[in-house]
Amino acid sequence: IRDSSSSRGLGDVYKRQVLVPLYKQGAADEESILRALYVASGIGAVIAYRACIAGAAGGCQAEIGSASAMAAGALTAIRGGSNAQIGHAVAMALKNLMGLVCDPVAGLVEVPCVKRNVVGAVNAISCADMALAGVESRIPVDQVIDCMGEVGRRMPVEFRETALGGLAVTPAGLAVKERMQRGEF
């Protein structure tokens, strides 16, 4: 399995940080990884249909949250979880990142995005572990997805990948932007 993803968002969490390491460490074979990718794709399609998966549309909760949910579901599946457990893992992963804004410094998908990917991956692993241990989401997965969509629609535009709010407009964030504009990075 080649890791050709260049994404710092959606693909990075579920593919680079969760599934590829499983394969490289010998914890899953290629067929299992491919099945997990189908599970992740199905989860992503449902989220995209019912809500959104882009930071510009719904904040980082939509991008990293969706990726984390896809990874949680895929990991639960690869480890033998039931469909119900997959749903619980997805719901918990989304709930944990609900409301997360998208505020890229200098408008680039770098800061804080790269570090949020790690949080998304850890969240996915934790939620898969909880679901496999029998922890259930009190709110059904479809309702969690719908809620995330509503939160994203109500989120001010400044917090939806515009670099007009959040960390992007802190003094340090603006200083990075100015240095980039001068060609110092």
Model-assigned labels for residue ranges:
Residues 31-51, 96-104:
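Acidic-glycine-rich active-site phosphate/pyrophosphate-binding loop
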Residues 68, 73-185:
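Functionally critical mobile loop/hinge segments
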Residues 2, 47-57, 104-109:
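Glycine/charged-rich beta-loop-alpha catalytic/anionic-binding loops adjacent to active sites
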Residues 22-43, 88-92, 168, 172:
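An acidic intrinsically disordered interaction segment
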Residues 31, 55-63, 111-115, 139:
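Alpha-helix capping and helix-loop boundary segments enriched in small/acidic/polar residues
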Residues 16-28, 72-80:
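Alpha-helical support elements that line or immediately flank enzyme active sites
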Residues 43, 49, 62-68:
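Glycine- and acidic-residue-rich phosphate-binding/metal-coordinating active-site segment common to enzymes
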Residues 1-14:
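Single conserved hydrophobic/aromatic residue that forms the stacking wall/gate
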